[in-house]
């Protein structure tokens, strides 16, 4: 496995591989890898001749009062996990390398960015779109793998790739959970032992909404009301959003259906966690 920091070196390396006819699978991350990332890497290993992992804490997708400075980093540990998952190339650029002096290009996105995380994190998805477009240009992947925990991000990247005719197959992978149901996230490391227990309210809310829907409940107000009661009963929990949306368009739904997305963002103390489920999907 090779670790590359320089943008031009990475680009030349993959262009050489492409000339040899190699199929490149790509897993873009912000590092501090966990089993969720490992599932993406292992799947990527089966989908390409060469597996590339990027590790880059992208400053343009963090807001002014967000956790850019404190976001957890562990390049040595990340590289060890990557190697165990069969990664061939790790691309870990610097912010200066990705955004040199004079950088000014943006990617204008459409209505998929407006609700959910887009409403509470203005500018976030603009930053995601720019860095993903740049990474696709540098790595030249045939396919790229993203987790469904960031459901809105996945939808936006699919749409952007389609609209801009980027020759990359976008693969969404299931959420990976801890044994007690908490969705794996690098930000879980911020939680105290007590907060870690409180964070289980997100999964409890998902289970309750799924249970009620399976029992025939389709009222959006009743489903979200039950979920909200579960969250607000937890001392340090505060709701950012709890919503039912169409899983394709992310538009609001009048009544819940099998293809409805239940998505939530909750702060446990100062740590913002997200989770989701499509009601008709196998959990």
UniProtKB/Swiss-Prot annotation:
It is an enzyme of class 6 (ligase). The reaction proceeds by a bi uni uni bi ping pong mechanism. The gene is panC. It is found in: Cytoplasm. Disulfide bonds: none annotated. Its EC number is 6.3.2.1. It comes from Trichlorobacter lovleyi (strain ATCC BAA-1151 / DSM 17278 / SZ). Keywords: ATP-binding, Cytoplasm, Ligase, Nucleotide-binding, Pantothenate biosynthesis. HAMAP family: PanC. It comes from the Bacteria. InterPro entries: Pantoate_ligase (IPR003721), Pantoate_ligase_C (IPR042176), Rossmann-like_a/b/a_fold (IPR014729). Its main location: cytoplasm. The lineage of its organism: Bacteria, Pseudomonadati, Thermodesulfobacteriota, Desulfuromonadia, Geobacterales. GO terms for molecular function: ATP binding; pantoate-beta-alanine ligase activity. It catalyses: (R)-pantoate + beta-alanine + ATP = (R)-pantothenate + AMP + diphosphate + H(+). One of its GO terms (cellular component) is cytosol. One of its GO terms (biological process) is pantothenate biosynthetic process. This is Pantothenate synthetase. Homodimer. Pathway: Cofactor biosynthesis; (R)-pantothenate biosynthesis; (R)-pantothenate from (R)-pantoate and beta-alanine: step 1/1. (R)-pantoate binds at residues 61, 153. The active site is at 37 (proton donor). ATP binds at residues 30-37, 147-150, 176, 184-187. Belongs to the pantothenate synthetase family. Catalyzes the condensation of pantoate with beta-alanine in an ATP-dependent reaction via a pantoyl-adenylate intermediate. Beta-alanine binds at residue 61. Pfam families: Pantoate_ligase. Gene3D superfamilies: HUPs, Pantoate-beta-alanine ligase, C-terminal domain.
